[in-house]
């Protein structure tokens, strides 16, 4: 009688069997004792070549679980011995990396290379790009299923159609079927290459066929359809690559400090001409014609400070307009002024402002018509382009006002700053602004001033005539009184 421990199905039982002396334990079918023995790496043969080992495959289903456990224990013990030997030779080496070099885990190396260590692994790692290519495939499928796309789904058979001059005009033939094949084989490095081939297909048809031809009209229709659908895919691609831009920009912080000292001295040079008297003489010729064409009648000395302010601000604005050449950052005052000017623009000019902003922010085209603008979030080039647009509009507006006799916009601003609550009355060519204190500043043309002078002289003569008349009446009255007293 002998006992055997049998395990299976999660439970263990002890059974007694009768065995004769001649009987042996049943062996697994198909696997001999020699086949079960696996050569293990030991200290004596760890550096032997693979030819010295007899690598045999073991079917785990043909042996018992107890033998599997024993086999695992032996393999683990041998593996620990190999790792200890590797650490003795190279203590700083990584055990996993050293074992990969020694050939012990040669099977794992095959698995790594077999899972797509080439293009598939790199292409699959970028999930965003894979999704974009899927969107490209769906867009191409819609184009090919269109009722007018049958002409472009296959290459042009120039010989069969008798188009002998086709290849002379069309240098690079392309069709949607070829694009589909290249997209399926992952031959496009980026979605932009896919878009170029689709455009090339329709542009070739537009180039070869005359205007009004059916193929010409089909090509225009499908090209417009593609461009409408491509906008969203292109935005996804731009947003995906924009996320990785900060990692590239981190490599360039070193040159920034060297550029900063060059930009900082510029603001220090700009305010210097305002306090000193010698620098202002060059700019006055620009503002001098404006002052010569306007004659100011000042009733009090309170209005005198208005004139130097208009003269001083002229060179500052000239320097500000020259500043964008250096692409410097706008100052806080310039940003505040730009924000105010943008709010004061008429509705027809806001469309141009939106187009300027969309150049650096293409994703705004997919949003609502209402755009919330943050001046600080815009880049330098966009800010300067907006600044030049606003200043150009103001200059054109001031020229129109001068042509109609309303004076320059800068003069109007300086007068507006010196008067708290102006009330404007316009009659003919004379404009008067009345302050709270009742003082008035009048602006008139030279011809009007001459008329005023002639009017004042006539009023003076009339006053003298009235004076003479009054003197005659006084003399008559005095003579009358004398005669009465005599009587």
Swiss-Prot record:
<keyword id="KW-0103">Bromodomain</keyword>
<dbReference type="Pfam" id="PF00439">
    <property type="entry name" value="Bromodomain"/>
</dbReference>
<protein>
    <recommendedName>
        <fullName>Transcription factor GTE5, chloroplastic</fullName>
    </recommendedName>
</protein>
<feature type="region of interest" description="Disordered">
    <location>
        <begin position="93"/>
        <end position="127"/>
    </location>
</feature>
<feature type="transit peptide" description="Chloroplast">
    <location>
        <begin position="1"/>
        <end position="32"/>
    </location>
</feature>
<comment type="subunit">
    <text>Interacts with SIZ1 (via PHD domain).</text>
</comment>
<keyword id="KW-0934">Plastid</keyword>
<dbReference type="InterPro" id="IPR027353">
    <property type="entry name" value="NET_dom"/>
</dbReference>
<keyword id="KW-0150">Chloroplast</keyword>
<keyword id="KW-0832">Ubl conjugation</keyword>
<feature type="compositionally biased region" description="Polar residues">
    <location>
        <begin position="415"/>
        <end position="435"/>
    </location>
</feature>
<dbReference type="InterPro" id="IPR001487">
    <property type="entry name" value="Bromodomain"/>
</dbReference>
<dbReference type="InterPro" id="IPR036427">
    <property type="entry name" value="Bromodomain-like_sf"/>
</dbReference>
<dbReference type="Pfam" id="PF17035">
    <property type="entry name" value="BET"/>
</dbReference>
<dbReference type="InterPro" id="IPR038336">
    <property type="entry name" value="NET_sf"/>
</dbReference>
<feature type="compositionally biased region" description="Basic and acidic residues">
    <location>
        <begin position="400"/>
        <end position="414"/>
    </location>
</feature>
<feature type="region of interest" description="Disordered">
    <location>
        <begin position="1"/>
        <end position="48"/>
    </location>
</feature>
<keyword id="KW-0804">Transcription</keyword>
<feature type="region of interest" description="Disordered">
    <location>
        <begin position="400"/>
        <end position="487"/>
    </location>
</feature>
<feature type="domain" description="Bromo">
    <location>
        <begin position="127"/>
        <end position="233"/>
    </location>
</feature>
<keyword id="KW-0805">Transcription regulation</keyword>
<feature type="compositionally biased region" description="Low complexity">
    <location>
        <begin position="451"/>
        <end position="487"/>
    </location>
</feature>
<keyword id="KW-0809">Transit peptide</keyword>
<dbReference type="GO" id="GO:0009507">
    <property type="term" value="C:chloroplast"/>
</dbReference>
<feature type="domain" description="NET">
    <location>
        <begin position="320"/>
        <end position="401"/>
    </location>
</feature>
